[in-house]
Amino acid sequence: VYGHEITNTARITKMNMILAGDGHSNIEMKDSLANPIDGTSTYTDENGVVHHNGFDIVLANMPYSQKTKYGKLYDLPSTNGDSICVQHCMKAINSASANGRMALVVPEGFLFRKDLTKTREYLLKNCQLQSIISLPQGVFLPYTGVKTDIIYATKVNQKIKDSERNKSFWYFDVKSDGYTLDNHRRKLDTPSDLSKYEEYRKFDKDQVENMLKVGFEIIPFDKVHRNSNILVGSRYREQKAIISNYDIVTIGDVATLVSGYGFPVALQGQAGTIPFYKVGDMNLSGNEIEMHDSRNYVSIEIAQERKWI
């Protein structure tokens, strides 16, 4: 295991690995972005044997929305840390490895922001995107409330013929990870969607019906390319006409609209009986709210205290 960490957390990591009896000598305290690893380069050992630099597998939960001064060291120079972090992880994969793959936790903004279009194009060109896992907002609380996704890709840094490329990738939307989506992160009695994702590992990926049964969606790359390489899977869902016996009413007739301040994070979560919605609950690519699936509830007592009811 190799790893870089810019803060003193690197020392804690090394200590934990020592206590666990695992190797720890390859954990270093340094700025990863200032020290890119070129997985396409080679070196010769003392016996004259040529080896490739880089790694077979890269796992990363990168810092979100940071700025960097080391963008010039990468193929797409930028001060945007999200772009450079993804490029750094890709660059570190051994190009000679037939099994070179990576799993990256990225802020959801990486999947749709206009200023990162070129980076997404670079990603799709230099690897085979296999799946994107959408995580619920709040999964990393209390450290950050940023909405995140997992990118899983194979054949990183390899030259892939067009005829060998997949025509689509899998998208899975996690609604619940088995814990409350608040600062307390209490374990829920209800099943976790992650248990469904575990089925992914058991299936032959060519058995499409089985994948669809556990909740995966197929996202065609041709649609992605026509939409600025936006990778938010929900954007490409087929719109189904819904016939309802209920009259259409304005939202003000069925809900209390409150604006002007943020709702305290400490009060957000699954505890309570009254659902509430925030601007952040909107689908980032479509301005639609899933009214049947609120991420947050509030108790009657708090709603009365806030004079909402």
Annotate the PLM regions:
Residues 1-127, 131:
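SAM-dependent methyltransferase catalytic region
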Residues 40-45, 144-152, 185-193:
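Short, surface-exposed amphipathic charged segments that create phosphate/polyanion-binding patches used
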Residues 58, 168-175, 185-209, 280, ...:
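Short, intrinsically disordered, charge-balanced linker/junction segments flanking boundaries
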Residues 89, 151, 234:
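Hydrophobic, well-ordered secondary-structure elements that form the walls
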Residues 129-158, 164-165:
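Class I S-adenosyl-L-methionine
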Residues 152-154, 173, 278:
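Short, well-ordered beta-strand micro-motif
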Residues 205-264:
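Non-catalytic DNA-recognition/assembly elements of restriction-modification systems
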Residues 252-267, 282-309:
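Sequence-specific dsDNA recognition surfaces
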